[in-house]
Design a protein with these regions (language model features):
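Membrane-proximal helix-loop-helix units in multi-pass membrane proteins
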Residues: 6-49
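Membrane-water interface at loop-to-transmembrane-helix junctions
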Residues: 1-2, 32, 97
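C-terminal transmembrane helix-loop-helix hairpin of multi-pass membrane proteins
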Residues: 36-37, 54-128
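Alpha-helical transmembrane segments of multi-pass integral membrane proteins
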Residues: 2-17, 41, 66-74, 106
Length: 128
């Protein structure tokens, strides 16, 4: 389950801090710019977590923190002007929160499943 938490942090939580889930039809920046930023946010979080967890030198966690924070310091692309649509703002907040909850459940199940598979593979390898 630890790897499920890491997966959630890297692929859902870190990118959502800059680009929360958006309702369909809402005003947003260009798709390509958002995709590039998401890639760098997830990549920076992955590299950052790896450097913090598997550090062999004192400076590696520092580089990991910088890698994790850099996309957020640069900033995610946002539209120049927001145009409110027919949907209430409360719905957008509820959608973003629900999206994170569903992703957290997904990554928890994924981490548990991976742990079960790995433990059964170890049992089979020991029995052979």
């Amino acid at each position: 389950t630890v790897w499920g938490v890491v997966g959630f942090t890297v692929f859902a939580l870190a990118p959502a801090l800059g680009l929360p889930a958006e309702l369909p039809g809402s005003t947003a920046a260009a798709l390509e710019a958002r995709q590039v930023w998401w890639f760098f946010a997830a990549g920076g979080a992955g590299v950052g977590v790896a450097l913090m967890v598997f550090a062999r030198n004192w400076w590696m966690p520092v580089v990991g923190i910088v890698a994790l924070a850099l996309p957020h310091l640069v900033g995610a692309p946002h539209p120049e002007a927001y145009v409110s649509g027919p949907l209430p703002a409360e719905l957008a907040g509820q959608f973003a929160a629900s999206s994170l909850v569903v992703q957290a459940i997904f990554w928890a199940v994924m981490g548990w499943t991976a742990g079960e598979v790995w433990s059964r593979m170890d049992e089979v390898a020991e029995a052979a």
